[in-house]
A protein has these predicted regions:
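Juxtamembrane helix-loop transition segments at the membrane interface in multi-pass membrane proteins
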Residues: 1-15, 38-41
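Cytosolic catalytic regions of ATP/NTP-dependent phosphoryl-transfer enzymes
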Residues: 16-161, 167, 180-191
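The conserved cystathionine-beta-synthase
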Residues: 171-180
Length: 192
């Protein structure tokens, strides 16, 4: 306890420290844990030569139609300010179980935003290699897609990829040192 106090650590219950000394695996969520939690859209990869809509206007209207505050949505909102010009007639909010969200707009079809492998039903191999390269480099890639169908919580039969949005979140300056400490202490690290 005295050693920890010297390192400006408050010990409220000693048994917690004893339990922590037996930890041999630490599971971490990358976003906001080893990153700074300052996600931004760093690149836009067009996926079609003839998009069905102006990307800025579509994603801006999408942001304006949904009320969400997760890190990805906030980063998209910074890059594509909410415009709300298009009239939304149906919304499917994001859920971590579904991994996508959508807004159906009057006279414009549905804009879908989510995980490429989910929106494309496992056919993400159809995407250009640059998408997989960005994912392999640790970036989050979000697919913007379009469907002529009205969407109410179930993926439509036809989803047309429009663009891949590459999001980056800077690594915390002390992350390397922290992770190295746990490795030296024989604690397995798992990024979930």
């Amino acid at each position: 306890v005295i050693k920890l106090a010297r390192k400006k650590t408050l010990v409220q219950e000693l048994f917690c420290i004893e339990n922590l000394s037996r930890v041999d695996m630490l599971c971490l969520d990358k976003t906001g844990t080893i990153t700074q939690g300052k996600m931004t859209v760093s690149d836009i990869l067009p996926l079609t030569a003839q998009p069905p809509f102006d990307l800025e206007e579509a994603v801006g209207s999408f942001i304006g139609a949904l009320d969400d505050n997760n890190a990805t949505f906030l980063a998209l909102g910074e890059r594509f300010p909410a415009r709300g010009r298009w009239r939304a007639v149906c919304r499917t909010p994001f859920s971590s179980a579904r991994k996508w969200s959508s807004v159906t707009f009057e006279g414009r079809g549905t804009v879908l935003v989510g995980a490429p492998e989910i929106l494309l039903r496992g056919r993400s191999g159809l995407l250009p290699p640059a998408v997989a390269e960005r994912e392999a480099a640790g970036c989050r890639v979000v697919l913007v897609a379009h469907s002529e169908e009205r969407v109410e919580g179930v993926l439509p039969g036809t989803v047309r990829p429009v663009a891949a949005l590459v999001l980056e979140d800077p690594i915390r300056p002390d992350a390397r040192e922290t992770l190295a400490f746990f490795t030296r202490e024989d604690v397995q690290l798992k990024i979930i």
